[in-house]
Structures are given as structure tokens and as C-alpha cells.
Amino acid sequence: ATIHHWVFIRQKMCAWPVYADLGAVSPEQMKAATSALAMLSLSDDPQAQLAAAQSYSMRKIPKSLPVLAPKARYGHSKLRIAYLSSDFCLHPVSMLTAELFELHDRSKFEVYGFCWSPEDGSALRKRVMAAMDQFIRIGALNDAEAAQLIRDHEIDILIDLHGQTRGARPAILAYRPAPVQITYLGLPATTGLPCVD
């Protein structure tokens, strides 16, 4: 973690090259400690970005978690789409997605929001909540409980709006509570998570 923060600070200081040899810590060790988000500004090489994301997921995500989603389709009359985020408040993610939530064709889709966002009382939060057919707070639940709750709602497609950004809860995805899981918007790069389709 210390190396990750050192790389981050050098980026903020515009101290180039970021991966300067420290003697005891090689540039290769620094690259291995770089987050997926930080790698976006350090390299345009897709392989380097994937390696950074996978390194993070290997360090942070529990292994061998039970898969909760069934292999067969649920067969609902409407496809259940759920959005997972801590940014359903006065935040750029909500600014960019509120209309998206509102525009889902309700004759074909049932829209869920699973959140651990702060209750900021903003008009934007109220708009996001109103745009969901079901808005469910999971802030008091641990990752296993949150994943089970998502599974209990028989979500067909789970859309994570974080990726590997601050506030993310990728371990929820690691339980694979939905048959199809994707990420959108929060991190404009790969997550490197094997549980994301």
C-alpha cells in the first residue's frame, strides 16, 4: 500500500518519471502496486492497464467465494436491471445517470438501485430515487449480505458504477449475485475482475 501511495503522490506532483528507481524498490515493483485508475494516466498500453487492474483484484478480492447466481435464467416478464453505487447523491455519477434511469422502458425493464450513498437530501438524490422502481440501501450490510440481498431480488443484470474507484465494493460482485455483471462509467478502464462480464 505504501508504494501505491508513493506512486500516487508522484503523479500529483507531476514528478516524472513516476517510476523512478528508489534502490530498494524497483520500477517493476511500483508498476505492480499501481491501481487501475492511476495506470490510466501513466500508460495507454491496454496490457499494462489490465495487469494493474488484475493485480489490485488479486490483492483485494476474496478468493473462492460461493457463486450466488443461478445458471438458468429467471424468466421474469420484465428484465431486472440493478445499479450498484455509493454515488446516488450530489455526485457526477448521478448527474450523468439520472436521465438514463428515467429513460428505461418500463414495459420491458424493472430498475433497481442498490446503494450505500450518503443521505445528502439533494434534489439529485431524490431524482435518482424516484427514477428507480426499487431503491434499496445496503450501507449497513457487509458484502456477503449485500450480495445475498441482490440475489434474493433475482436481478438479471447488475451494473456496477464504481469499478476500482473510491467507495467501491468489488467483493459484492465477487459473489456473482447476478447472472450478468458489468461495470459502467465510474472507471473508464477494465476492472480486471474475473466476476465482471
Pin down the residues of each PLM region.
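Alpha-helical solenoid repeat scaffolds of the TPR/TPR-like class and their adjacent stem/linker regions
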Residues: 1-197
